[in-house]
């Protein structure tokens, strides 16, 4: 399993099927980049200038909204993940 370092978070992107108001399903090339995911691994947190470590605010299993162009896409063990910094997370759903 991937173990992120520092303030990095590993997420599995949640793909949603997009339809227009009239019911037409959009092809992948016309879709917006997804911004929703599920946290699968969390780093140990960021370190402040004084050396104090701040624990991440998200936990494994959280559903999140993240910045549109954030993170690095990686493929591991046949699955695609996104590794991003905690600061790229905009909100936790629910």
Swiss-Prot record:
Pfam families: Cpn10. SUPFAM superfamilies: GroES-like (SSF50129). SMART domains: Cpn10 (SM00883). Its main location: cytoplasm. GO terms for cellular component: cytoplasm. The keyword Amino-acid biosynthesis does not apply. It comes from the Bacteria. Keywords: Chaperone, Cytoplasm. One of its GO terms (biological process) is chaperone cofactor-dependent protein refolding. One of its GO terms (molecular function) is unfolded protein binding. The keyword Cytoplasm applies. It is found in: Cytoplasm. Belongs to the GroES chaperonin family. Heptamer of 7 subunits arranged in a ring. Interacts with the chaperonin GroEL. Together with the chaperonin GroEL, plays an essential role in assisting protein folding. The GroEL-GroES system forms a nano-cage that allows encapsulation of the non-native substrate proteins and provides a physical environment optimized to promote and accelerate protein folding. GroES binds to the apical surface of the GroEL ring, thereby capping the opening of the GroEL channel. This is Co-chaperonin GroES. It comes from Geobacillus thermodenitrificans (strain NG80-2).
């Amino acid at each position: 399993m991937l173990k992120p370092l520092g303030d990095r978070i590993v997420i599995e992107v949640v793909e949603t099927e997009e339809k227009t108001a009239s019911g037409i399903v959009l092809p992948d090339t016309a879709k917006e980049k997804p911004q929703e995911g599920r946290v699968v691994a969390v780093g140990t947190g960021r370190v402040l200038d004084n050396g104090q470590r701040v624990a991440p605010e998200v936990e494994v299993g959280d559903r999140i909204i993240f910045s549109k162009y954030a993170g690095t896409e990686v493929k591991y063990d046949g699955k695609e993940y996104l590794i991003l910094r905690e600061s790229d997370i905009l909100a936790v759903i629910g």
